[in-house]
Regions:
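A residue-level marker of the well-folded mature domains of exported/periplasmic proteins
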Residues: 19-259
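Gram-negative bacterial Sec-dependent N-terminal signal peptides
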Residues: 2-19
Length: 259
């Protein structure tokens, strides 16, 4: 997702509230430490300034969990902003199910919610804004298969359970592989997790177990790995592993690559 779309998200929230002297918009990311979320923050601040300059005074609140697997902290942030009766919430839920009740409670309390980046299993939100993650994953799977000549062994290293954006991308990746019967998927049930350390350990375990393979590593990237950007706005990176295997890094958001 393009982080500069925060202006659109703010507009969607504003269209659902009764105008007051100053509108208070809470933007709640999945995490706050990585480059992607810092760029999202910059986009939110830009939207705040532009709306205020255009005659709609907006005060932005930015708060989220430090780690992108801390469901409890993100739930608490949503509940706290609901209790403060902000004008609206813009939320990137790190779990598609765990944030359903907090969002429902916010809407019931009169606080409209826009979901971005990763979907929520709910119909309570005003709108949902994101890239086509299934299509992005499909592009990655098709490209990896072609780079391997349509033959070989494949490992899919997933991100984490409950992350709707990466789950859609993983589904697209696997769907693309169906067109290549000579490719063998030997692992698709392991998770990288939210940090460099957990991703590195997961990948090392798979390397030790399976040896030379082709990889689809869907969740990881950092600002140094931006080599190819496709139509879906997703960065990808190819490289040759030390074991001779071909790797594809095809991220969802700005998390450090473990390689």
């Amino acid at each position: 997702m393009n982080p500069r779309r925060l202006g659109l998200l703010a507009s969607l929230v504003l269209s659902s509230v009764v105008y007051a002297k100053e509108l208070t918009i809470a933007v709640i990311p999945k995490g706050t430490t990585h480059e992607f979320w810092k760029s999202v923050h910059a986009g939110a601040v830009k939207a705040e300034r532009e709306l205020t300059a255009a005659g709609t005074p907006v005060k932005l609140f930015w708060k989220g969990p430090l780690r992108e697997d801390d469901r409890d902290q993100q739930i608490q942030v949503v509940e706290n902003f609901t209790a403060r009766n902000v004008s609206g919430i813009v939320l990137a839920p790190l779990d598609s199910q765990a944030l359903v009740n907090p969002v429902r409670s916010a809407v019931k309390a009169g606080v409209p919610v826009v979901i971005f980046d990763s979907d929520l299993k709910s119909d309570q939100q005003v709108s949902f804004v994101a890239t086509d993650n299934f299509k992005g994953g499909h592009i990655a799977g098709d490209y990896l298969a072609k780079r391997l000549g349509g033959k070989g062994r494949i490992i899919l290293l997933r991100y984490q359970v409950g992350s709707a954006s990466t789950e859609a991308r993983e589904a697209g990746f696997l769907d693309a592989l169906k067109a290549y019967p000579d490719l063998k998927l030997i692992s698709a049930d392991q998770y990288a997790g939210p940090t460099r350390e957990t991703a590195y350990q997961a990948s090392q375990n798979l390397l030790n177990r399976h040896g030379q393979v082709g990889w689809g590593v869907l969740p990881q990237r950092d600002r140094h790995d931006r080599h190819d950007q496709g139509a879906e706005g997703n960065w990808s990176r190819w490289w040759q592993g030390g074991d001779g295997g071909l790797r594809l890094g095809f991220p969802v958001c700005g998390r450090p690559s473990p390689w």
